[in-house]
Amino acid sequence: SVEQEDVVGVDITPGCIRLAQLSGDDDKWTLSKLAYKYIEDASDITSIKNESDQYVNKLSQIISQGKITTTNAAVSIPVSSAIIKVVNLPLMTDEELQEAVDTDSLWENVVQLTDNLDEYSIFWQVLKRNTAENQMDLLFVASKLDDIDHYLNIVRQAGLNPVVVDVRCFAIRNALELRKDLTKSDAPIAIVEFGVSENYILILHEDSPFISDIYLSDKDRRLLSDSNIDPVLH
């Protein structure tokens, strides 16, 4: 939550909108509200951009039907709208790293972006420092501001106030950290998502993420979107 205020999670995909709200007590979380609606005739992620009014209307309906009272929202954006890299850098102090970030020289030297830096929202985090080898690993996540705005405009027009934005795979990772039985060991954890628009694997090991797209043929995509397939295949 943000400053102890309630926050509702909003997940918008081409074919479905989901809302979820948790309640916490003594470090334990309970799913208190869950609501969703399917979007008819949504083909791919471009539907969200080209038919935004439909998504606004559906989201407004879900808020009402799900009896969501808070207006604060945590919004997920798709992996396909983000550039995610773990970059290896010479060891720097926090002050040196912040100075390099503030001058944009760090990203210009280590990350090749297709557009100007000011067209991206950038998040970074030091994953680990290796003083013996004088190296450090840094997580770099960049999302186009235009892509983010498409989602935030839908959320705002439906009456919510987006206070948190996160890439979907990392939102899932953060939720997974609440599962102490899974995160207490050093064994790698894999998160796999298959769908019409998002297909990737995220492997977590020692707090370092590795993410890779999974290629699906057009035939496989049609199979995933076919509501009449054998339930065993779901």
Spans of features found by a protein language model:
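Hydrophobic/aromatic-enriched cytosolic interaction surfaces used to assemble or bind macromolecules
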Residues: 1-234
